[in-house]
Amino acid sequence: MRHYEIVFLVHPDQSEQVPGMIERYTGILTQAGGQVHRLEDWGRRQLAYPIIELHKAHYVLMNVEASAESVEELETAFRFNDAVLRSMVMRTKAAITEASPMAKAKDERDSRRSSEGERRSAPAEATEEVKETAEKAAE
């Protein structure tokens, strides 16, 4: 079995269908004895150039170990699904399991946002404590 990196773009109007599509496509690979090493749903992102007058698409990345026949079957499924705008299958030398740069950037943004939220809530808690001490002093 060989290792592959697969990226496919889904029509933005079909974003709700992506989890089902991922399940169907991973099922094709695992039924043939393949294994999914990494699966990342990057969500709806801006396209570099318009495809069929669309400026956004839903991106999905998969790193798999599978037979050539099952990957060929997957490519056929992509071709006959109108919701899949583009797909790319690349053969890799080894299994890639670490997070992609896209996922790392998203994790950093999420952690930054959560730390900013904590900083914003901390002053509010401090002012509540000041109010409580002021009320006690007034009594």
Swiss-Prot record:
Keyword Ribonucleoprotein: yes
Keywords noted in UniProt: Ribonucleoprotein, Ribosomal protein, RNA-binding, rRNA-binding
Molecular function per GO: small ribosomal subunit rRNA binding; structural constituent of ribosome
Role summary: Binds together with bS18 to 16S ribosomal RNA.
Biased composition (Basic and acidic residues): 104-139
Domain of life of the native organism: Bacteria
Signal peptide: none
Keyword Chaperone: no
Disordered: annotated segments: 97-139
Pfam families tied to this protein: Ribosomal_S6
BP terms from Gene Ontology: translation
Gene3D superfamilies per UniProt: 3.30.70.60
Organism: Shewanella sediminis (strain HAW-EB3)
Protein name: Small ribosomal subunit protein bS6
Family membership noted in the UniProt record: Belongs to the bacterial ribosomal protein bS6 family.
Entry GO terms, CC: cytosolic small ribosomal subunit
